[in-house]
Amino acid sequence: MNTKYIFVTGGVASSLGKGIIAASLAKLLQARGLRVTIQKFDPYINIDPGTLNPYEHGECYVTEDGAETDLDLGHYERFLGIHTSKANNVTTGKIYHTVITKEREGAYLGKTVQIVPHITDEIKRRMLLLGKTGDYDVIITEVGGTVGDIESQPFIEAMRQLQWELPEEDFLSIHLTLIPYLKAAQELKTKPTQHSVQELQALGVHPDIIVCRTEKELSPELRHKIALFCNVKPGHVIQSIDAWSIYQVPLNMEAENLGKMVVDKLEIPGLPEPDLEALKAFLERLKHPLQEVDIALVGKYVELQDAYKSIQESFVHAGAANSCKVRVHTLQAENINDGNADEVLGKMDGILVAPGFGERGLEGKISAVKYARTHNVPFFGICLGMQMAVVEFARNVLGYAEAASTEVNPRTPHPVIDLMEDQKSTTIKGGTMRLGAYKCRLAEGSLARSIYGTEEIAERHRHRYEFNNAYLRQMQEAGLKVSGVNPDTGLVEIVEIPSHPFFIATQFHPEYKSTPEHPQPLFVHFVKACMDKR
């Protein structure tokens, strides 16, 4: 069987959920026994989102091989239970960088380098790259942005060319659009969808399936109208109605026959019925919790829901594993201090101090750590959260009042957190941190060892600063146990306080590897500790 290529575009408005639709379709195909992966093509000129402020584009998701990518890759991994890679996220910046580098090397033999064919050829090469590995039956490509945007036009043109170049049964186009509901008229309006599809068709791409985001059910008459004016088969207009959980969307799409439509169009015979029992069992646990807990997520980007997307989703997975509803309260670190910590955090069953960069909000994070440590509240720190746990311990237990990270105070007399040695000569910011999966050896008898149930793990990282091993002996003697280290470098990966009911912090990002079917163990045990406290 030839590799099949599916493209998902969006129209009318942004943030309709192309990534969720792409991941849901991938889940339906995977459940039929097909080998599927998804790739995201982003039309911004940044090489990757690694240097983007989370307020700009949400969370930066890190893959096993160290790629800093769009948060949609997190959805892909969580829905499918697979690992993505650098090849799964392509930006305009990467495309132009490759083409300009080739031009400087003389690869184009003196030709005038243009959008068409040189940029579009490179886009097509990347679109087909994963399909040529032989590892996948189906490649789903999500094209970022909205049809009509100037920056996405080269990607649409590359799609148009592939639609013409590939066999008809190997190419499928899905267009996600919005059907707004006018409350005053009590009517769903199809005109924006008609215009969006017409614009896509004017660019030479003809969608095979139209998925309509809507608050209300689409009547058969409305579906027929959309099909008629958008030139698709009557049965190929389907609805994506607002769901109570994103993990319900694959089941909704299966009920709309999306999986069957795609398999039929791509002419893939002999597939079994989809096996979605594990997903249904997860949703059943999620929908019927036996207990509830309140957990504070203390961070500096809390105003944007997507800034801590993987952490939020990890709590969903861990909650279902414990048959517990986790209410996550996102708290702005800048608003927390020693004086109001009891008022702000007193009703919480657990405290998680989130990752981040820079000075803003650090003292608030330290106050949150102190409150959790001194009031026996279950605590979980991630990356910067772990570093601030170390700073708080140094200040308030070791008595080093001026202890700090050199990230914010290069002249501190007690640099308990310091720049990694191999980072000290680095001047380029993008893609130069310690990124991707690294090994961590867990100490015998530690909380971390009991949680993971194994001696060695591998988790993903994204940081420049580390625990300063010059303070290792003093910290351990005072009660802060180092329970996880990198076996190759000795870099401290996990700290915990054995005398505390549950106090653990990691330099790595465990949230990147949590899925509904395999919830991350640290999150599962943290939620369990919060339940026990309550």
Positions of PLM-derived features:
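Extended hydrophobic-aromatic, low-complexity segments
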Residues: 304-307, 320-324, 338-341, 360-364, ...
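Beta-strand->loop->alpha-helix junctions that form or flank phosphate-binding loops
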Residues: 236-241, 329, 408, 485-488
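Cysteine-nucleophile active-site neighborhood
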Residues: 16-19, 23-27, 31, 344-439, ...
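Short beta-alpha connecting loops at secondary-structure transitions
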Residues: 56-64, 243-247, 353, 374-380, ...
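Active-site glycine-centered loops adjacent to acidic/histidine catalytic or metal-binding residues
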Residues: 42, 383, 394, 463, ...
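C-terminal and late-domain segments of enzyme folds
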Residues: 435, 439, 443-534
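Flexible phosphate-sensing "switch/lid" loops adjacent to ATP/NTP-binding sites
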Residues: 1-324, 333-350, 357-358, 365-371, ...
